[in-house]
Amino acid sequence: MEDQMANLRLTDFEFFRIILPGSSKTKLKLPYKFARELGDRELREARLRVAGEGRRPWDVKVFDDDVSGDVYLGRGWQEFARAHDLRDGHFLVFRYDGAAAFTVTVFDETMCRRDYRRHHDAAESGSSSSSDSSDAAAAVATAAAEGVGDVALSQFAVTLRQCNLEDKQAQYLNVPMEFQEAHEYARREKVVLRMRGEAWTVRLKHSRRERGQRTAFRYGWHRFCVDNGLAVGDTCFFRVLREGDLRRGGAADDHVLKVAVRKADGTTLE
């Protein structure tokens, strides 16, 4: 019963990993917090599935580093990464589905969700030199359109420019149109940004444009940037942590975004 309750706590647990230059190609470290939540349970094998993929999951071994105590995805990870063409700078969102299964969503260097169907179409136009490469292409091709909208609209990424980091009175960050429409930002007055265990309340500024209403992070955004030492070239990843209840009114709802940052030098904040 205790193991079942622990599994319930972990179900839908999400974390991200960034493929950094020089990182190991044969293993991927799992976040300390996730490993801690596993507790004494031994997770020896995981099943990875790209979001929307219809075929069987990929089997990947899980191991502990006896010296550091860190937990890694090991044997099988390199094959998964190669089949899905994971490269430096790619941003991976893992969702734990329970029973050692993970759903993985991949965002590439354009900060957009990767469309594996398009890559497969290009691969099919060429010839396959071995059964291994054919199998890998077939696995990549199974990514389908199911669920793409929900996942894609639950998060967005922005690389900071000078206009996002000007003096306190002029500082702002525009929210992508599709994201703000999906979460009804026109009816909201504020959002809460969470990072590194802390929270910042940011007021929203709405303005009318030819293509419709535009929403930007405004008052409170400056404090968030200063407190976290953000600079031009840093990339911020925003993900909906809690939607908030609009029925209580825009001023009273608690719409929460989880923020992670990839600094221009390759280090990360989360």
Curated annotation (Swiss-Prot):
SMART domains found in the cross-reference section: B3
Record's subcellular location: Nucleus
Domain of life, per lineage: Eukaryota
DNA-binding residues (ranges): 13-110, 158-265
Molecular function GO labels: DNA binding
UniProt cross-references to CDD domains, sorted A to Z: B3_DNA
A cellular-component GO term for this protein: nucleus
Lipid biosynthesis among keywords: no
Disulphide connectivity of cysteines: none
Pfam families membership: B3
Key words of the record: DNA-binding, Nucleus, Repeat, Transcription, Transcription regulation
Protein name: B3 domain-containing protein Os03g0212300
